Amino acid sequence: MLRWITAGESHGRALVALVDGMVAGVEVTSTEIADQLARRRLGYGRGARMAFERDAVTVLSGLRHGSTLGGPIAIEIGNTEWPKWEAVMAADPLDPAAAAELENSARNAPLTRPRPGHADYAGMLKYGFDDARPVLERASARETAARVAAGTVARAFLRQALGVEVLSHVVSIGASAPYDGPPPQPEDLPAIDASPVRAFDGQAEKSMIAEIEAAKKDGDTLGGVVEVVALGLPVGLGSFTSGENRLDSQLAAAVMGIQAIKGVEIGDGFETARRRGSRAHDEMYPGTDGVVRSTNRAGGLEGGMTNGQPLRVRAAMKPISTVPKALATVDLATGDEAVAIHQRSDVCAVPAAAVVVETMVALVLARVTLEKFGGDSLAETRRNIEAYQRSVADREAPAARARAIRG
């Protein structure tokens, strides 16, 4: 079973991603990982920290000459600002002189005014901290860099095993007019990445940028909606047999686990609830290569399984909780009214969030693909996939024959 985990703090020495269960023979390089990390750092409305964060990638294990070995893959992303934070975030106790010097450091000042909407308050109470630093260091969205590194391996596997491409675009930011056209294709990705807000439409881009500029002027932050599309998936990934095996439940859990994500929908999602059944589902017809559909309202999933249509997943990101126009809070050291702490942050991180949602979708799809087809090497997995696809084609053959007879 494919598993992944990350470790590290926002201002710590490094972030680490560990991927276990990947087959041997998948071609992936540290350059590809760095390229995906660079995509995560894109976006209009990002804060000054993006100029400081430099994602230095080191693959510690699991790859040899650009190919996976079948063992655990460990990836390190170094923090180039570590020398500034070494004393604050040191793993071991400091000597008395260093501790005395740190006592007067602004970086080490206790953070006792939790930010509404962040993990600060509940984390301090749950874990018994008198300072929000230990909470915000791990709760920070900086952790998603490690997920993107892990997801790069999953992307490579999906592309090489199935020919699957996973891409994303921003649907809306704040109150901007949402994009409601057809989903993008792989050839559209360079243009999307070239957009400052990762928009698939020029008018939508202008509306999003205007929203960001207005929020920046007002000292505020913005959220938005992103869409991920996965193309080339076979029929039958996931299962109807139990709730935890349904692919939509796995995708929803993975995407909701991303910092600041507050909602997930598959296909037309909540809009489907407003329709009658005759307008909510995707009717099937015999086609030249089997069953075809005229719509994809289900977003590629029916009964917890892929149905051969493009997978469409949308996620709603809330506005960043570190608001320059500081929100009211309570100082947990004194119990007095206060304004929330303000760390260096972005006005809008929705374009970056789209890349992270891509990552989590790719990881889940890689996991269910390996669960379905198994194998110790990429070549073995491919053979299993090809045998299954032949079987599916045979089952669909009557529909193709019916279409041919009709004409």
Curated annotation (Swiss-Prot):
> What are its GO biological-process terms?
amino acid biosynthetic process; aromatic amino acid family biosynthetic process; chorismate biosynthetic process
Q: Which GO terms describe its cellular component?
A: cytosol
How does the cofactor attach, per the note? Reduced FMN (FMNH(2)).
Q: Which reaction does it catalyse?
A: 5-O-(1-carboxyvinyl)-3-phosphoshikimate = chorismate + phosphate
Binding-site positions, FMN: R138, A139, S140, Q259, A260, G303, K318, P319, I320, S321, T322, R344
Pfam families (alphabetical): Chorismate_synt
Among InterPro entries, the record links this protein to:
Chorismate_synth, Chorismate_synth_AroC_sf, Chorismate_synthase_CS
Record CDD domains: Chorismate_synthase
- Family membership noted in the UniProt record: Belongs to the chorismate synthase family.
In Swiss-Prot or TrEMBL terms, this protein is called Chorismate synthase
Which species is this record about? Mycobacterium marinum (strain ATCC BAA-535 / M)
Gene that this polypeptide is encoded by: aroC
